[in-house]
Amino acid sequence: MASKLSFKRMDSIAETMPDALRQSRYQMKRCFQRYVSKGKRLLKNQQLMEELEKSLDDKVENEKLVEGFLGYIICSTQEAVVLPPFVAFAVRMNPGIWEYVKVHSDDLSVEGITPSEYLKFKETLYDEKWAKDDNSLEVDFGALDLSTPHLTLPSSIGNGLQFVSKFMSSKLGGKPESMKPLLDYLLTLNYRGEKLMINDTIDTVSKLQTALLLAEVFVSGLPKYTPYLKFEQRFQEWGLEKGWGDTAERCKETLNCLSEVLQAPDPTNMEKFFSRVPSIFNIVIFSIHGYFGQEKVLGLPDTGGQVVYILDQVRAMEEELLQRIKQQGLHVTPKILVLTRLIPDAKGTKCNVELEPVENTKYSHILRVPFKTEDGKDLRQWVSRFDIYPYLERYAQNSCAKILDILEGKPDLIIGNYTDGNLVASLLSNKLCVTQGTIAHALEKTKYEDSDVKWREMDQKYHFSCQFTADMISMNTSDFIITSTYQEIAGSKEKPGQYEHHYAFTMPGLCRYATGINVFDPKFNIAAPGADQSIYFPFTQKQKRLTDLHPQIDELLYSKDDTDEHIGYLADRNKPIIFSMARLDKVKNITGLVEWYGQNKKLRDLVNLVVVAGLLDASQSKDREEIEEINKMHNLMDRYQLKGQIRWIKAQTDRVRNGELYRCIADTKGAFVQPALYEAFGLTVIEAMNCGLPTFATNQGGPAEIIIDGVSGFHVNPINGREAGIKIADFFQKCKEDPSYWNKVSTAGLQRIYECYTWKIYATRVLNMGSTYSFWKTLNKEERQAKQRYLQIFYNVQYRNLAKAVARAGDQQARQTTTGVAPSEIVVRPKERKPQTRMQRILTRLAGQKPPVSE
């Protein structure tokens, strides 16, 4: 096959393609004439291949050409712009590696072009005036990263932490003076003004090495469990402060680790040392849109897996922080704040409570800060994530003041979530000079095809002009980016990843991104989350099963009557159940699954279908996409006459009961299906597999990495519903013939989870990132400052104007409420009077200033 051909990175397509064209000149002339015959247009990969095959009459010649080098190039082309007589190709030979060429259809001459030139070529299809304007806005973030080291191998993408450790080892190795940046960094470590690890008496690398040697010899002579307090005074005599460990043995390990780094740094010791550095105590996490809460929120608009992810993340990170702080020998109380929006019209949730403890944690809270209308009142109602942009800058200012008050100082790490949370995290990290991590969860640009070049058509509804601009700002501002899978960053051999789609793109009439984000940037890291195993455990663990919930679940699945909670019924309860649970929107593709089922008679004969998704009545929803999908669901149930075979249950918010629901589906020997058009990760896939359910999941995105196809589950192509339906039906037919096959797949799925997906691994990795990147960014401070200034300009001249143009939903209603927000509708945390230090007063004053636009 053409896709199996080798291609050396050093080879240039512009150099090698002319010879290949000459060897098949007659056939390729016909092919290119066919490409240009229909005038200017954009051709996707499948269209390119179809046109190539149609232009070749001889089957043997066809196969020879398709299997050869030219076939390989066209197979690797993601899209081509046709502007007769030219055809410009965007060729992606490997993940993250792009080359652009244009071919003259008459003489088959080939010319290499830059990403910017290709984008101008493409813009001509949509806005020729903009494309030809020499002064059209072009942004090139890559030009500001020229001295930043980058990974080079596609297989290494996402291993940023490992790469950074290697590079730091190389840069700091050699002469003792090269270690000065590390010494300077260690001298900055403190907790509320109290020095950690070393004090100012150690002002040279040689003094540090001497102190380490003396201390290591000393603790080597002590019983290994001797508490730090027993020898704290001796350490201080050598210029060493607390933070090395809680026992003599732990101190010895940390001392030795740093000594090894200073003597001959290597990546392993470098990463190990920074995992022990006491630099992170207080963390702020932003998740702004939707209804963020701990109960009665799942299934509400813009509220789904991200909420579950963050709550589990917080519990895991607090547990890891507490363990680290204890092992560091410190008596410090860590704090984690999840910043979200306070919504006065809370719809029966606690989203109107200002400060709420996170369940099953000691020191973590949800802090809710309201959006403000233009006249300063609290915005009462929910706002779609697509309409949120006019509120974010002021929200960042108000959040900053609250954070500094509650934490009594700056946080040590800020993590953003989704576009809105990442933008606000960028604003605050720049304002407070704090290390920033970002998590996309989903990048809308990849969900909607051609949403960049066709942004005008979608902007009134989705405001992608704001969203894509905000995404580019936060990606480039962030110190590190957390992803759940490789595919999220760089996709697969055939298809670019979410982030890779932002490498070079254009929004004609708005902005051209000659370089947006480079997936070889060492800021990219993969940290796969897990599932809460106290809730999601195998159906075979009978002693833990929540049998008290079985009557409720039985009614939910099998009662015959339509209610406000469910419609449809299952006439034959002896059939296995295929089950799906997700938000009811286009991308989650629940209606697609219903259509697959409705079209496949064999599948309908073998199994029942149960879906948990959204609301059942369109009149009860305010979400545009959900309303469309609700109506589509009703139409599909009528069209395929599914009553008796389908149960549609409205969104369920009780995670504990949902865990038992998964297990009850497993009791029927059923399966879980995740049919999304694209899924960045797939928490429900992890949950289902944790419960022992054989799982079918989309091959578009993260689930393709979670599941080993045919072993621990199955991949389905959401674009080909008939094929997906056949694959699911074949599985159940095989299980009917061989019942042990179901158990085999179930067991393999559980094994996959236990080997790869736990929250403990996740929390350890993310905290290591926070510590390591805090030092890493000091090594290229000047370049980083230059890029921040560039980003500040871009924020001010581009994003701010775009955000102002978005209508402020609900402002008129808020103005009509003359008394503002009724006190009974917002639960405010008790006021605490604290004496403020001079530094706290300064920080509080800073909080009142406008954020200097971090990105």
From Swiss-Prot:
* EC number(s) given by UniProt: 2.4.1.13
Recorded GO molecular functions are:
sucrose synthase activity
Which major enzyme category is it? transferase
Return the annotated region ranges for GT-B glycosyltransferase: 279-758
Tissue expression from the record: Predominantly expressed in roots, flowers and immature seeds.
Keyword Transit peptide (UniProt): no
Q: Which reaction does it catalyse?
A: an NDP-alpha-D-glucose + D-fructose = a ribonucleoside 5'-diphosphate + sucrose + H(+)
- Topologically, how does it sit relative to the membrane? Peripheral membrane protein
Q: Where in the cell is it found?
A: Cytoplasm; Membrane
Biological process terms in GO annotation: sucrose metabolic process
Keywords noted in UniProt: Cytoplasm, Glycosyltransferase, Membrane, Transferase
Q: Which GO terms describe its cellular component?
A: cytoplasm; membrane
What is the recorded function of this protein according to its Swiss-Prot or TrEMBL entry?
Answer: Sucrose-cleaving enzyme that provides UDP-glucose and fructose for various metabolic pathways.
Q: Which family does it belong to?
A: Belongs to the glycosyltransferase 1 family. Plant sucrose synthase subfamily.
What name does UniProt use for this protein? Sucrose synthase 7
